[in-house]
Amino acid sequence: MEEIEELIYKYALQNAYKHGGKAQDKAVVSKIFVERPDLRSRAKEISEIAKKIVEKVNSMSIQDQERELKEKYPDLLEEKKKEEPEKKTLPPIKVEGKFVTRFAPNPDGPIHLGNARAAIISYKYAEMYKGEFILRFDDTDPKVKKPIKEAYDWIRKDLKWLGIKWDKEVKASERLEFYYSMAKELISKGFAYVDTCSEEEFKKMRDASKPCPNRLKSAEDNLYLFEKMLNGEFKEGEAVVRIKTDLSLPDPSQRDWVLLRIIDVKKNPHPITGDKYWIWPTYNFASALDDHDLGITHIFRGKEHEVNAEKQKWIYNYMGWKYPYVEEFGRLRLEGFMMSKSKIRTVLEKGVSIDDPRLPTLAGLRRRGILPETIIETIITVGLKVSDATISFDNLAALNRKKLDPIAKRLMFVQQPKEFIIELSEPIRAKIPYNPSKPSEYREILVNPGDKILLDAKDAEEGAVVRLMELCNVTISGNKLIFHSKTLEDAKKLNAKIIQWVKKDEASNVEVIIPDPNEEKPPISGYGEKEIGNLKINEIVQFIRFGFVRVDNKIDNKVTVIFSHE
């Protein structure tokens, strides 16, 4: 039996080290059965043993786990290095000559994980082919998808956080005169007309594949009507400019769709132009014209734009332009999170901030402690899949943990603190590395006989012998911690749990916010070691045996952190 326990211990250590100090008993058992298939007949027994050993391994600090691996199973550390996957890259695409792409967000809300996909893919391809990347704000709807003035900066900040640099910035709302001139050109060539029918009348005729009367008028007559629109002689809903398509197309939405419409900007002023302009282009008209005028060669966007591409090609064909190369992909969801931009906007209107860590916005994920590299790698891994994809937060957290493990400080935090007096024959100085990957960087904590020590109540079992991480082994007796022995080897012989601790007279007051998109959870209060009080806002660290947290605020001796993940 000792041989089996040793085997389980070995793979539990390896699994814990690979996953930020937390082994999974099922994964360990699977590994055992691969090496020892003869043990499958004893599956229940092996699983019970594994559960106990994994619990013991998980109580160790990651420093102790690594030390054990180095001393007893160094080959498993080498195996971890060999298992590192190759860096993910996007697949090659067709490129002929110049490469220019763009990201065209509507600044009607913050960017979330799903719509960041187009930005990241577009930028990474521009990098790959040494091309140009343009940020174009698609802000031509001051009524329905009304831009938010602050959202322009929200988007810029998010892109910079992702490491995205743009070569040019364009606001569609500042290009209205250009759209008007192109509308005149299309009307003069007989490719567009001014429709003065009511929406209901046009729908009846469109559904019957019949033309609106103005469609049959001369270019001169329609140009005259367009001038009247520009002069403000029509009100909202009284006239629109339509492109001439095929009235027999099977999809009614493709028949003579709207290029320009009138919006009452006295009621719905634009955040940039106010009430200066009242004729506004539709998404498809502005996008088609800008993509050509800006020299866009490649477009990366969601497959929901398939219908829009068909509409835009009418303009390209009429003008004799070449349509850009397009790659379309499915929607991307973060499981359990609200991904609808309109729903997020509704929540924001109720006073929730864009960086609320319960939201899947980039600002919310950033505040939660998710790294930009994690977002980018996630998007690149999903790539250009046409099918919709759903990412679990657990998978996002696993990737984030992998990136944080080698760099984040490991610090001690105690929730549900219980106070003890430590009995020692002499002072002991604990020397604790911040991270096992950099043993030369450490802090020292001097503990004197009679000092008050805080332990987590769940670790404070009466009569138990426990190891105070990197300090010594003690027996819990009433309100005292009585010195038992010094070394880690002694603790192993006793099967002693290795626990975090905090020296009371140096303790930092800590509040942990637990973000949950589905329910309101009260914050966790506790105490942390002195070093926590020295952390900077936005610093991400690991609370040992608790999880990763990001420092959100510091007031006096109170440090507020947001829980990221285990």
From Swiss-Prot:
This protein's UniProt keywords: Aminoacyl-tRNA synthetase, ATP-binding, Cytoplasm, Ligase, Nucleotide-binding, Protein biosynthesis
UniProt short sequence motif 'HIGH' region, positions renumbered to this chain: 105-115
Listed EC numbers: 6.1.1.17
Record flagged with keyword Cytoplasm: yes
Single GO cellular component term: cytosol
Cross-referenced Gene3D superfamilies: 2.40.240.100, HUPs, Ribosomal Protein L25, Chain P
Family membership: Belongs to the class-I aminoacyl-tRNA synthetase family. Glutamate--tRNA ligase type 2 subfamily.
Summary of the function given for this chain in its UniProt record: Catalyzes the attachment of glutamate to tRNA(Glu) in a two-step reaction: glutamate is first activated by ATP to form Glu-AMP and then transferred to the acceptor end of tRNA(Glu).
Protein name: Glutamate--tRNA ligase
Species whose genome carries this gene: Sulfurisphaera tokodaii (strain DSM 16993 / JCM 10545 / NBRC 100140 / 7)
Gene name of the record: gltX
